[in-house]
From Swiss-Prot:
The gene is Rlig1. InterPro entries: RLIG1. Functions as an RNA ligase, in vitro. The ligation reaction entails three nucleotidyl transfer steps. In the first step, the RNA ligase reacts with ATP in the absence of nucleic acid to form a covalent ligase-AMP intermediate and release pyrophosphate. In step 2, the ligase-AMP binds to the nucleic acid and transfers the adenylate to the 5'-PO4 terminus to form an adenylylated intermediate. In step 3, the RNA ligase directs the attack of the 3'-OH on the 5'-phosphoanhydride linkage, resulting in a repaired 3'-5' phosphodiester and release of AMP. Keywords: ATP-binding, Ligase, Nucleotide-binding, RNA repair. This is RNA ligase 1. Disulfide bonds: none annotated. It holds the Pfam family RLIG1. The keyword Chaperone does not apply. Its EC number is 6.5.1.3. The keyword Nucleus does not apply. One of its GO terms (molecular function) is ATP binding. AMPylates itself (auto-AMPylation). Its cofactor is Mg(2+); Mn(2+).
Length: 327
């Protein structure tokens, strides 16, 4: 499958959305819901969503691979957010106006500091060479994940910079009905965005690992193509999510020909997530580390995921939930 678009900005919904004054099922303590109407959005139509590649929206945290210190590095998402005074002004403005775009930001003074190594996301809007905050008042960006990072320990667990590899979950190249966990050179993932999923991410919707033996992987965006999708109509998509085995996913992301990404989340359709039994957990999974350790001058840490998976290389499991590593 060819490389698809990367997530460098907030994705719009495929439908026009409306806000309802009901408690959110997605965010605790949020007193409103954002629901899809039956009208396709102008952005979706302009991007020719009818001819886009539909893929599974995977529930994790967004990451990015690009160079740092002269080699490919994994980067964690870090949005630059307004300081207390600016946030107060922004929220007051939103109550009196309809569009966040009319608000005037001072990017030098209105935002909390970020590490020097922080970089803004690629596709965000810029004015006079400076990044413009999105409709939430945030500037999406990235920070490199250093080896042994405590703040980003789960990110760090899926990469090894000495070996230059990442632990990746995707379809088996010879059998789309089988998942594969493999060690992939970071150089092959350059300029891609991926989703970090696992035990300690977003409440672990896929039931991976355990507190005693946490388990995490990177999944490239667009890795799981959705086939046999119904027509782009609200009720047809609703029925597909509710009734089809393939519909037991968080949502759909359409990768459009112009690089635009369009999404729909189960919550947009008033449906629940997470689910007790996900489509991702309905497929067998095989371990293919394919590492010739004789080619390296260093060895894996005994506790690392790479070492643990090397011990069960070539084994096959009925589903992801069944993988339990020795501690």
């Amino acid at each position: 499958m060819k490389r698809l678009g990367s997530v460098q900005r907030k994705m719009p919904c495929v439908f026009v959305t409306e806000v309802k004054a009901e408690p959110s099922a997605k965010r605790e303590h949020q007193p409103f819901k954002v629901l899809a109407t039956e009208t396709l959005s102008e952005k979706a139509l302009d991007a020719d969503v009818y001819n886009a590649v539909a893929t599974e929206k995977v529930d994790g945290t967004c990451c990015y691979v690009t160079n740092y210190k002269g080699q490919p590095y994994l980067w964690a998402r870090l949005d630059r957010k307004p300081n207390k005074q600016a946030d107060k002004r922004f929220k007051k403005f939103l109550h009196s106006k309809e569009s966040a775009k009319e608000f005037h930001w001072n990017t030098e003074e209105d935002f909390k500091p970020v590490p020097e190594c922080w970089i803004p996301a690629k596709e965000i809007e810029k004015q006079n060479g400076k990044p413009v905050p999105d409709e939430n008042g945030h500037i999406p960006g990235w920070v490199p994940v250093e080896k042994g990072s405590k703040q980003y320990c789960w990110h760090s667990s899926v990469v090894n910079y000495e070996f230059g590899i990442a632990l990746v979950l995707r379809h088996h190249p010879d059998d789309p009905g089988v998942l594969e966990i493999s060690a992939v050179p970071l150089s092959e993932l350059l300029e891609q965005t991926l989703e970090l999923i696992g035990t300690s991410i977003n409440g672990n919707p896929y039931g991976l690992g355990s507190k005693k033996s946490p388990l995490h992987f990177l999944t490239p965006h667009g890795a799981f193509q959705v086939r046999n999708l119904p027509t782009l109509k609200h009720n047809d998509l609703l029925s597909w999510f509710e009734d089809c085995r393939e519909g037991q996913i968080e949502g759909i992301v359409w990768h459009c020909g112009d690089g635009c990404l369009i999404k729909v989340h189960r919550h947009h359709l008033g449906l629940c997530w997470p689910l007790p039994d996900t489509y991702m957990n309905s497929k067998p999974v095989i371990i293919n580390m394919n590492l010739n350790l004789n080619n390296y001058d260093c060895a894996f840490d005994n506790q690392s995921l790479f070492n643990q998976f090397s011990k069960i290389d070539k084994q096959k499991f009925e589903r992801l939930k069944d993988i339990i590593l020795d501690v």
